[in-house]
Structures are given as structure tokens and as C-alpha cells.
A protein has these predicted regions:
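Flexible, acidic glycine-rich loops studded with aromatic residues
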Residues: 76-91, 97-248
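Beta-sandwich strand segments
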Residues: 188, 293-295, 442-448
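Active-site neighborhood of glycoside hydrolase catalytic domains
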Residues: 1-89, 96-104
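Aromatic, loop-rich ligand-recognition surfaces of beta-strand-rich domains
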Residues: 338-401, 412-461
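Short, compositionally stereotyped local motifs that mark structural "simplifiers"
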Residues: 198, 202, 208-354, 373
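Beta-sheet entry/capping signal
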Residues: 22-25, 75-77, 90-92, 109-112, ...
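Short proline/glycine- and polar residue-rich coil/turn motifs
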Residues: 406-412
Length: 461
């Protein structure tokens, strides 16, 4: 409707009186097109303006808003979705869905502000042992410092259009200012140094040394900053010959001592090398700075026939949720905290998760359990279905019949059991395809966009 533009212009007129800035950010993101396809007036507008599809309708809309604001002496900024259907002539693009939108805009000689979710969304977790509820993701300070806002795909002239980068922090999970501070500091210092320093002057080693001094300044300012960088960190690694897993502990602090304790042994031992784990157990790690206990971590391992075995992914997970690669799905650690500990998930945007697991030898298999997550408000939907094939030689795979039992427990933990109908089934190799939900339908959170598929662990029993 033409009246829609009149309403927007009235609103923008008031915005302009409040904000005398050169730039006005108009958004333009996450707009599903389904309703436009059903709207007779939208379809008529497309015919009148000779627009071939709804993407061009969005571009028409953005360009009209831009023309109005340009006439007021202002310039627009929009999220990278404004590229769809054709970019408005004078628009500046904020590239948040990765860097590709920024690359495309710069190649069209448009100014760009890089703000990809990975690594400059500061509402994401900054520790694998995050004790604070977050929206998900994992952007530790070292990843922030390593960020280079000018992509290598751009030549010298195109690179001039990269104005810089911006950190974003959405506040759905931040109810009070001290939590905002916790997520902001010290990552904002890392990004500031990245953006203010010549590339050749950056030194991660030197920055780490200066963190201690920075923390003293934060203390004086009474800022509730995060010390996650110095926390005791855990990682799970494959063992030699795929026999069990290894539990690794580390901290960035040069002084102090790391110790650990296995659940079947009350003795606390000094940590020297990764701990070999070959059965279901609970391990604890301790970091002592002198005699003071600074940090404690706990890891629970659920062993089954797939734990620690060789696994391959047909297609890698999204770079926003890569976990530790395919091994994440057989590391024996099941996420019981939900999206807040998203590093334990592999996330697939619109794609299926297809894996092949080598159990090492031919063995009985009675069921396969796929652990995942459903969080529709975050566009994470249950899988459409799961396919299972088995093989003794790794080359010739056969379908296998099974019953399915699905339940949601705890923090939206999706547990799907594939119960084999033939109780005498034996195999060495399993090929498991977890089908993505697909395009999110109208009326659902994220309608019109690709659904996320989150997979945590695959059990074979």
C-alpha cells in the first residue's frame, strides 16, 4: 500500500529529529516472503513496477526508503539481506551472516561494516565451561583477536570499502548490567586492538601479557569482567587406534598447578599429560594458583560402542557451530545444558548431517541413539527423519529396519532412539543421515528461512 510508505516517512521524520547522525540504520533483515506471495496488493505492486520476484520487491522497498532519506541528507545502513534483489544505490551494508554479504557489497563498490556472528557477537559464550546462560555460540577472546575484517577475496580497491567491524550483543539473556559487562569485557579490548592497529603490529602473545594489567584497571573501575580466558579449559581428543578418548586440561596462566580426580579413585593426582578414558566415568579437574583453588571443571563421559571411534562427515557443520569437527559426535560427552553450551553441538543451516562411523570390528548392534536439540525460538528445529545403513566392508551399505522413539528431556534435549527390528544385527560400519527440517513454514519462528539442525552425540549400543 502506498500508505505504508507514508507511515514510514512520518516515523523516519521523527527519528531524524532525534538522531542528527549522517547514517540511519533501517534494518532490513530476517524478512520472510511467504506473506508477500499471498498478498494481492504486493503481487500487484510487483506487476506495476515490473519486479520479477519477492526479493526484488524487498529491494524496491529499501530503495524507496533510501531515496527518501537521501533527500533529507542522510545515508542508510542495512543488514546484508538488503543485497537480495539488488542493492540500493548508496547503501552501506552490515555483514552479519558471515562475511559473504560484505564481500559481495564491496565488490559492487559499496561501503561495508563487518559484523559476522562468528567471532564478533559478544552475546555468545566465551568459555567451553560457560556458567552463564547465553544464546549459544562460542567466541572466546583469542578468536576475537585473530579476526581480520578485510577478507582476502578483495583486491586493494575493493578493500577500501571495508570501513571496519562492529561487535554486536543482543540482550535476550542479559537481565542486568553486570552481565552485559561480563560479556563485553575484555573481548571489546581485543576487537579494539584488532581494528585500531596495523595488521603487522598485532601480537597475540603481547596482548596476553597486557591482559593482567587491563584486569587491574577493570578492578579499579569496578567492572564485572570475564576471566574465562584464564579458566581451566577441557577438551576431548581421540586416542591412538580409536580406543577410548583422551581428556586434556589446560590454562593460559603460566604459574600454578593442574590436578585431576577420577570418579573411581578418591586420590587427586597431578596432571602431566592428557588422561586416558575408556569407560563411563566422571572426571574433575582443579587449578591451583599457589595454595588457592582458582577453578574446578567436571566432565561426564557416557561410553558406548561408538565412543572414540573413527567418524567422518560428508559435509562439515556451519562455521558458526563447528564444535570440534566430526569427533564431537562420538566424544562421549552429552550436552545436558542446552544451547548455552553450544560448543558440544554441530550446527547445520539448512543442510543434513551425514556421518559414517567405523566401530573397528564387526559387532552386535541393537540400537542407535541420536542426541540433538530443539529450540524453535532460535530457529533450531527437530530433524525431518533419520536414515540408517550398515556395512561390514565400508563399501557396500544396506538399509536396516528400525522403530523410532523420540523424547524431549531437560534443556530441550532431543533424544531419538533407532531400535533395530532384527535383534541379531551385526555390523562394523554405520552410515547415518539426519535430515534437516528444511525451510521453516509460515507462522513459525524464523518462517521462510532455513532451519538449523543441531546434533550433539551419536550412541551405538
Amino acid at each position: 500500500k502506498e500508505n505504508t510508505f507514508k507511515v514510514l516517512q512520518d516515523v523516519l521524520d521523527e527519528v531524524l529529529t532525534l538522531f542528527p547522525s549522517r547514517y540511519i540504520h533501517i534494518g532490513g533483515d530476517e524478512c520472510p516472503k511467504e506473506n508477500w506471495k499471498r498478498c494481492a496488493q504486493c503481487q500487484q505492486r510487483m506487476k506495476d513496477e515490473h519486479l520479477k520476484d519477492e526479493h526484488e520487491l524487498q529491494s524496491y522497498f529499501i530503495q524507496r526508503v533510501e531515496k527518501y532519506l537521501n533527500g533529507k541528507g542522510r545515508r542508510i545502513i542495512g543488514w546484508d539481506e538488503i543485497l537480495e534483489g539488488g542493492l540500493a544505490p548508496n547503501a552501506t551494508v552490515m555483514s552479519w551472516r558471515g562475511e559473504q554479504g560484505g564481500i559481495d557489497a564491496a565488490k559492487q563498490n559499496h561501503d561495508v561494516i563487518m559484523t559476522p556472528g562468528n567471532p564478533v557477537y559478544f552475546d555468545h559464550s566465551q568459555s567451553t565451561n560457560e556458567d552463564s546462560v547465553t544464546i549459544g555460540g562460542y567466541n572466546p577472546i583469542e578468536k576475537v583477536y585473530a579476526y581480520e575484517p578485510i577478507p582476502k577475496e578483495l583486491n586493494e580497491d575493493q578493500a577500501k570499502h571495508i570501513l571496519g567491524a562492529q561487535a554486536n550483543m543482543w540482550a535476550e539473556y542479559m537481565a542486568y548490567p553486570s552481565k552485559v559487562e561480563y560479556h563485553l569485557f575484555p573481548r571489546i579490548a581485543a576487537l579494539s586492538e584488532v581494528l585500531w592497529s596495523p595488521k603487522e603490529s598485532k601480537s597475540w602473545e603481547n596482548f596476553q601479557i597486557r591482559l593482567n594489567t587491563l584486569f587491574k584497571r577493570y578492578d579499579l573501575m569496578k567492572i564485572n569482567y570475564s576471566k574465562a580466558y584464564f579458566d581451566l579449559k577441557t577438551s576431548v581428543l581421540p586416542s591412538a587406534n580409536y580406543n577410548g578418548v583422551q581428556w586434556k586440561l589446560e590454562t593460559k596462566l603460566k604459574s600454578g598447578m593442574i590436578k585431576y580426580q577420577a570418579d573411581d579413585n578418591k586420590k587427586i593426582s597431578t596432571y602431566l599429560l592428557p588422561v586416558k578414558v575408556n569407560k563411563s566415568s566422571v572426571l574433575k579437574g582443579f587449578f591451583y594458583n599457589g595454595t588457592k583453588l582458582e577453578s574446578v571443571v567436571t566432565e561426564k563421559f557416557h561410553f558406548n560402542k561408538a565412543t572414540g571411534k573413527k567418524i567422518t562427515l560428508t559435509k562439515a557443520a556451519s562455521p558458526n557451530y563447528p564444535g570440534d569437527g566430526a569427533f564431537t559426535l562420538v566424544n562421549g560427552v552429552i550436552n545436558e545444558k542446552g544451547l548455552g553450551k553450544s560448543r558440544e553441538f554441530l550446527g547445520f543451516s539448512g543442510d543434513d548431517c551425514e556421518v559414517e562411523i567405523d566401530l573397528g570390528n564387526i559387532t552386535d548392534v541393537k540400537n542407535v541413539i541420536v542426541h540433538g536439540l530443539t529450540e524453535k525460538g532460535s530457529w533450531i528445529y527437530p530433524h525431518k527423519n533419520i536414515e540408517l545403513k550398515i556395512s561390514n566392508d565400508g563399501e557396500n551399505f544396506n538399509d536396516v529396519s528400525f522403530d523410532v522413539a523420540t523424547e524431549i528431556v531437560g534443556n530441550q534435549h532431543l533424544r531419538t532412539s533407532l531400535i533395530l527390528k532384527d535383534e541379531k544385527t551385526t555390523t562394523r560400519y554405520l552410515k547415518i543421515t539426519i535430515r534437516n527440517y528444511g525451510t521453516i513454514p509460515s507462522g513459525m519462528a524464523g518462517a521462510g528461512h532455513k532451519a538449523w539442525l543441531f546434533v550433539d552425540e551419536i550412541e551405538v549400543n
